[in-house]
Design a protein with these regions (language model features):
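Predominantly five- to eight-bladed beta-propeller fold
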Residues: 1-46, 150, 241, 249-262, ...
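Structural motif
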Residues: 2-7, 31-33, 78-84, 130-136, ...
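Serine-hydrolase catalytic core recognition
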Residues: 2-6, 66, 72, 212, ...
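Conserved beta-propeller blade repeats
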Residues: 19-33, 50-74, 80-88, 93-125, ...
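Glycine-rich, acidic and aromatic/proline-enriched surface loops and short helix-turn segments
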Residues: 33-41, 128, 282, 307-311
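Short loop/turn segments that connect beta-strands within beta-propeller blades
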Residues: 38-42, 88-90, 139-142, 201-205, ...
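Cysteine-rich, disulfide-stabilized extracellular repeat modules
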Residues: 43, 93, 118, 130, ...
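Beta-propeller fold detector
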Residues: 45-48, 93-99, 145-167, 208-212, ...
Length: 326
């Protein structure tokens, strides 16, 4: 059904052609079903999603009681998504909880995550205000699904009570976990070349102020089971790696586990400069990185290698080690 696309393996002594299935734009796409296998009965059931032609079923997650599952359906134009709940025993649609559209595209990247202390509430991630943020859904409180205009130029309809937990000109990149005692969500966020770990309270919406004192850096985190401490692994432009144990109550360093030395210490290294230029819309900042040779002379002309990757989901210029240069 899906057209084969040839890939040449140049690592073999004699080049070999390996065909893969790739749904090229405008050509036939595969028809996918979502099935559930029960090991105790050795039987399969399939969700009654209707005709699967030109429909994608993504970001599947189980309900805490395992009696239903959730998925985010995307049309092939990828400009309309629906968050749906299906019965895991019958495969029937139970309810639609949310819809979102955009003239260009809508891009759900993460399955919903239920609160560990309340199986009627879950976190949904959306870019409907222009940045990826966290939204708290309360499935107990049903509302009439009116259509609203999004800040990013699209529309949305919600069928239950929804509260936006994070907001600002920055984006949530990863949910690390929860602190059930404090009712906090611990997450990683990015603003330009800055990144860091933060917490937002699901009860009152309060959070430690993002990026108020952050430096340009690139952070990765590993949270403990109770959500009280995390291992913060990060780098800056000039520092290859720092690993700290961090208390998530105030996000203060508790113990420094590692401060690595530069592997290039004593070597002459090219200079690295960063900055921004405006995109075609005249508003959006596009970050760039310039690397100059050690003996750079501004009065001379040099050949230039220009590398651009338009994405998505690949931040080439970062606040981390050597600003992301390799």
């Amino acid at each position: 059904m899906v057209t084969q696309y040839p890939l040449v393996d140049i690592t073999a002594r004699v080049g070999e052609v390996n065909n893969i299935r790739y749904p090229m734009a405008g050509m036939t796409s595969h028809k996918v079903q979502v099935g559930i296998y029960n090991p105790s009965t050795d039987k399969n059931i399939y969700l009654n999603t209707g005709d699967p032609t030109n429909r994608y079923f993504t970001n599947i997650s189980w309900a805490p009681d395992e009696k239903s599952l959730y998925l985010i359906e995307v049309n092939r134009d990828q400009n309309h998504v629906k968050l749906c709940q299906y019965n895991a025993e019958t495969g029937e649609l139970m309810q639609t909880l949310y819809e979102e559209t955009h003239p260009k595209y809508v891009e759900p990247q993460n399955p919903i995550v239920f609160l560990p202390w309340d199986d009627t509430k879950f976190i949904y991630q959306s870019q409907r205000d222009g940045y990826n943020h966290l939204y708290l859904f309360d499935t107990r409180t049903k509302i009439y699904p009116e259509t609203h205009t999004s800040a990013n130029g699209g529309t949305y309809r919600q069928y239950c009570k929804v509260k936006q937990l994070t907001k600002g000109d920055w984006l949530v990149s990863e949910i690390l976990g929860f602190n059930a005692k404090r009712k906090d969500i611990i997450f990683t966020a990015i603003e330009g070349l800055k990144s860091g770990h933060f917490a937002v309270n699901t009860a009152n919406g309060k959070m430690n102020q993002p990026f108020s004192t952050s430096q340009e850096s690139e952070h990765n985190g590993l949270l403990n089971a109770s959500g009280t401490y995390l291992i913060d692994r990060y780098s800056t432009k000039d520092q290859p790696r720092i690993i700290n144990l961090v208390d998530t109550k105030k996000f203060k360093e508790t113990v420094n586990l590692l401060t690595a030395k530069s592997p290039y210490e004593g070597y002459q290294m090219p200079s690295i400069e960063t900055g921004t230029i405006k995109a075609a819309d005249g508003t959006t900042d596009l970050h760039f990185r310039i690397m100059k040779p050690t003996d750079f002379d501004s009065s001379k002309k040099y050949p230039v290698i220009v590398y651009v990757y338009g994405g998505p989901h690949a931040q080439c210029v970062t606040g981390g080690w050597q600003n992301g240069a390799r």
